[in-house]
Amino acid sequence: MKKILITGSNGQLGYSCKEDLSEKFDLICTSRSRSKGTLQLDIFDKNAVSNTLKKFQPDIVINLSAFTDVNGCEKNPHLANKINFEGVKNICDNFDGHLIHISSDYVFDGRDGPYDEYSKTNPISVYGASK
């Protein structure tokens, strides 16, 4: 059975992923805060990310960790960048498998939709730029 490591598994998308994937995959569920059935993993901690990926050797990582408060990102762009960019970079720097990263339509300016994964980005907010 393939192993999937899910970051941010305690969020809304995380719960849905766990429900939809648990019967077909071996799931390693992580979150910044500890909870039942979830390993604590701070994706800003390069060593913790590296050690977790080495220990579990997942086939796939689904990154659901994100700072999703759009107004909060505007008020604290440093934190938005740390969560939505630097944490993802830590995963990419330590993982050669398949990464599924959830982005946002905020990476676009809203002028030329509908968009797909090949559309050129043009964020108009801190949140969009951080994603």
Model-derived features: positions:
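Rossmann-fold cofactor-recognition segment
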Residues: R32-N47
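NAD(P)H-binding glycine-rich loop region in Rossmannoid oxidoreductase-like domains
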Residues: I43-I83
